[in-house]
Structure formats: structure tokens, C-alpha cells
Amino acid sequence: MKKDELRYLQRLAEIYPTIGKASTEIINLQSILNLPKGTEHFMSDLHGEYQAFSHVLRNGSGAVRKKIDDVFGHTLSNNDKRSLATLIYYPKEKMDLVKDTEEDMENWYKITLYRLIEICKTTASKYTRSKVRKALPADYAYVIEELITEKAEVLDKEAYYDSIVNTIIEIGSAENFIIALAELIQRLVVDHLHILGDIYDRGPAPHFIMDRLMQYHSLDIQWGNHDVVWMGAAAGQKACIATVVRNSIRYGNLDILEDGYGINMLPLATFVMEAYKDDPCEIFAMKGAFNYNVLEEELGKKMHKAIAVIQFKLEGKLVRRHKEFQMEDRALLHRINPEKGTITLPDGKEYPLRDNNFPTIDWKHPYELTAGEKEVMDKLSSAFRNCEKLQNHIRLLLDKGGLYTVYNGNLLFHGSIPLNEDGTFREVQIYGKSYKGKELYDVLETYVRRAFYSVGKEEQKKGRDIMWYIWAAPNSPLFGKSKMSTFERYFIEDPSTHEEKKNAYYRLWENEEVVDNMLREFGLDPEKGHIINGHVPVHQSEGESPVKCDGKVIVIDGGFSKPYQKVTGIAGYTLIYNSYGLNLTAHEPFTSKAD
């Protein structure tokens, strides 16, 4: 017997010290395998859109409505089914509406309770009693268990259940009980949640999404590039901090930082009022419709430009320090000719700048922060590192997340696997060593975790810097484009300079041989496995399908980000995997709970 096998057996002997206990566990596990498969729910690219995320989470991407159809078939009208589904999604709000129109609330309570009990029975039937018991709300656990469990010893079951329901109504607990049942159905309908990245980005409330996920009963997270840049910021990586702040200002979401995480923007605001007082910063207007007055808009533009310039300085120093990143083409400030107001890009072409006012750049040392910029970044770094709420949210990403997940025979990740044009795995240099395929994912994730857990300062620093690399590098599995053209989009009019060419993965995901090789690389059976990933919006309005390679690759960019919805034509896709198989759901843009 091998040493490892013996070690596992010794550990099992500690957990199950007798034949009886081991036998009981084997019987229990085998019985669970014979139950219907628990429903998995896949969501991706939430982009801070909490309201839309919450709605999809409540309805389980149609799983709740499907369960209503299973239970009631043709015995309920479509209107009644819709009304019941809405009640399960938003029980309190729906009951407030019903009370305005319903004349006999007692009768409505009774009918509704019985309907919810029937749905609870069906949703609970695919789980063990132990698992259902753990899901029950503490205040009503005993009563709900009585109502959804068949009691063979009770001869007159109808009278028994009637007495319980009538008592619930008589003592004035009907509304609270309905809310408890609705929330239980929401929980039981989805057994496990997969979030395939980009919880953070341009939307207004990623912190609310993280709060909700911290309470969720069973989930895993595949980090997106926007998640990793926030993780880098939380670890104190200054280029990541500047990126996060710039994105928040650009999309008018400083509330995330100031109200959501208590990160003070006053040092930056104070700095720009002096350093950029004579600069109108016209090309740095915020995107979207905001209720800002003229003074707030002017201040926002100055803050936007100031943090963008700081970001470009920090990134320039970073790529020059890490030659192995092979990203020196992203150091652009030294290529500016301030007298001519032009820039010569790495390809040798010269372009006029849309804005040639750089009051904080010393052209002899263009990547050095001024004393004022350094003070701003030191204060921001301290604020990010010492924000307890942010650190708790990042801890959830570390505890429940990773760069990829293998689950129930499927490979889940956010972006793309770096490939050569011939479909072979691209070798990528990470701190002096070459990695490819699964090994590349594993080493990058190891470095990310070292940023938070390593006791060595040098390893921590490498981990912090690798998070910026994962955010922006062409060879990063989470970015996967030729360059991140942030500078060009701000300062150069010519759209050809804005192009970000995608990794070969996106040109080869219809090639079955390449897809099979990727599945095998991660230990999966190509005949049964699937690749499920997000990151790239599916342009349904142009006829694009989210299903690639005869169903072996499924793209579920959630499309929660409102700007993308104008391009894609829908609010993206989510995926359900249950005992019936894989089911894609296309979503209409979410407007409001009232609608």
C-alpha cells in the first residue's frame, strides 16, 4: 500500500472508527447519489448591477416558474402562475399589492399557504431530510417540517394539515409564514450557485452583491479580471488602486468607495483643486446620466484626469521593473512630445493628443509621482488595506473563489485559456519560469494567494504585482487581448489605436479537437464535459449564439452591464444545470421590482 493511501485510510479511520459508522456513511452517500440532481445556477459578469442580480437570484433563472409548472400543470391559469411566481420572488411587496385589491384576505392566505406548501414539498423532495432541515428558517422550522413531511402515523392527514394552516392564520402569522416559505423555495430551488467572475466593474453596487453572496448557502466564484484588480487594490497594489478609483470616477460610482467602503476621496479632491485648477479636463467627463451639479462635474473631471495620469505613471514603472511581463509597450508617457502635442506609439506611428496638458509630469522623469500624487496614493493605499468591509469581501473571493473550478464534470472560468494560433497551449513567462495550460492557472492563483497569506515580504510583493498582470496582460487568462488600450482611448482620436485583438481562444472555440484538448488538460472527459465561461458579451442582435462547438462550450456573459445591452440586444444569459440537463436562459433588461 502506498504511503498516501495509508494516510487517507488513517484519516478515514479517525472520522469513522467503527464498521457501523463507516457502513452508515456509505449507505447515506449512496442514497444521496440516487436522489435527483440538485440544481446548479450559473451567473457571470454581474458588473455591480445588484438589482438585476438580485432579481435573477430570486427567480433562479426561471427555475421557480418551472417548479410551479411541475407542481400545478394545467390546474392553475397562467395569470395565477405568474402571480404565484411574483409572490415567491418578492413576498412582502406582492402581499402589499394583494391587500389593496383582495376582499377576503383570510381565504387568500389559506389558498396561498397550501400552494406554497405543495411547491416546498416538491423542491425538498430531491434532498435528504438532514439537508432540508438545515435550510429551514429557525423561527418556523418545526411547523414547516410538519407540513412538508408525510406522516404515516396520522390517519386523517387533511384535518391535521388544515388545523396547522388555520392556526397560522388565526394567530396573525400568515404573512410572516408566507415570507418564510417563499424564501425557503428560493433557497431549495437552487442547490449551488456558480459566479463566473466580474462581480465588480462599472455598476453602482458590487458591495451589495458581495454582502448577498456572503449569506448564500452554497457557492463558488471564478475570479474575473475586474475582481482581481479589486483584490490587488485591497492588498495595497497602487496601480490596481489607481485603476479601481479611475473606473469608479469614470462611471460616476464614487459612492461605492465613499459610502460602500468608507474610503475617503477628499485627499484626491483636495490635490486636484490645486494641481489641475487651470485645466478644464474636457475629455475626462464621466459616463452615464448623473444628478451632479456643475461644480461636482468639474471636480469629477479633474479627479478623473488626475488619477488616470497617476495610473499611467504607476503602470509605466511596473512594466519597466518587471521586464518578464513583456508589457513595456504599455509604458507610454515617455513617448509623448509635449512641444508638438503628439505621441509616437511603439509601432512608430505618431498621433496628435486630444489633451496635451500634463501639469504633474516631469518630462525628464515622466513616471515619477509628484509629492502631492505620492501623498494621495499613500492615503488611498492605507484606506484600501484597512477597510474591514472590503477585506471581508476579498476574503470571500479567496475562500470561495479561484481562477477556475472543475465541478460535476464541467470546467468553469471567466476569460480564456491562452492559446497559440495552432490551438496548442501558449507558454507564458511568470517570474522567470514558463507555464502553460492548467499549470499557468495554478501558478497565477498561487501568487495571488501569496499576496494575502505569505509571510515573506518579497513573495507578497510578487503576488500583489501579479494581480495587476492578471488584470491587464495579453497572456493573462482573464484578459486575453493584445493590449489594454486605456491610454489610447483617452488621448488618441484614431479608433484603430483602440483595437484590442482577442486571444486565439475566441477564434478556436468551435474547433472540437482544440476544445477536447482543453478539457483533457483539466482532467475532464471530452465526451461528457463542457467549458462554461463568461467575460465576452454574446451579440444576439447580430445572430451570435452562446453555444459553441456543438454544445461543448457555453458562453454566459450575464449582460448585467447596461451599456452592453445596447450592443448585445439582450441582458445576457444565465445557465441552469439540473436533473433534466443544461438549460440556457436569455434575459430581458431588468428595469425595476415594480415592473
Task: Outline where the language-model segments fall.
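Feature recognizes metal-dependent phosphohydrolase scaffolds
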Residues: 1-595
